[in-house]
Amino acid sequence: MSFLLIVRRTHLYLGLFLLPWVIMFGVSSIPLNHQGGEGGAQWTPIKDGPFTAEPPASADPAALRALGAQMMKAADIDGGFWVYRVNAQRVDAGHPNFLRPVRATYYVDQKRLLVERRSVTLEGFLTGMHTRGGYNLGGFWDTVWAVSVDLVSVALLAWIASGLFMWWELPGTGLRRWGWLALAAGAVSFALIIAKL
């Protein structure tokens, strides 16, 4: 089997592997680019009660993460979560579920924890898939998602490289000229937009 045939098959099967991911990123880009609010998404309280955990005195991320874990436990929420200190009197934490994310707000001065769940919306579902990432959420499936995104990123780069190699191996110069034109048009338009923004 020739090297070119290996590259072609790699390109083909990487394309098939990437298909659901590329479709997801393509479709989820539409609501990100055409934002019109949350399209009727509502946050519904599911728990509202006392909470007396002491917030960390310092800006130590580990201490804040520990408080977030207590908030999630009090909210009866399993899985990965994020946590953010809004100010001295408020700490937010949340579980970024694709369909029905949950957020918990700790009002420190009131010793109160408000837990809310967002209603299901197509816009929220799609943008959640597009923007979710990172290994810092801590849940098993959150880590699986992060690893998958890394694998897809590497596969996309390999797919691009194999496509460039196949283009370069085209016989004659006529077809290669069209490739140079496409590369130049893409690079110039991208650079121009980046420079102007």
Task: Explain the meaning of each model-derived region.
Residues M1-Q42, T143-L197:
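Internal alpha-helical transmembrane segments
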Residues P96-S153:
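Extended, hydrophilic extramembrane loops/domains of integral membrane proteins
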Residues L4, S58, E116:
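Charge-dense, low-complexity intrinsically disordered segments
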Residues G37-P101:
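Membrane-proximal low-complexity regions enriched in glycine and acidic/polar residues
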Residues K73-I77, G128, R132-Y135, L157, ...:
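A structural signal for alpha-helix termini and helix-coil/disorder junctions
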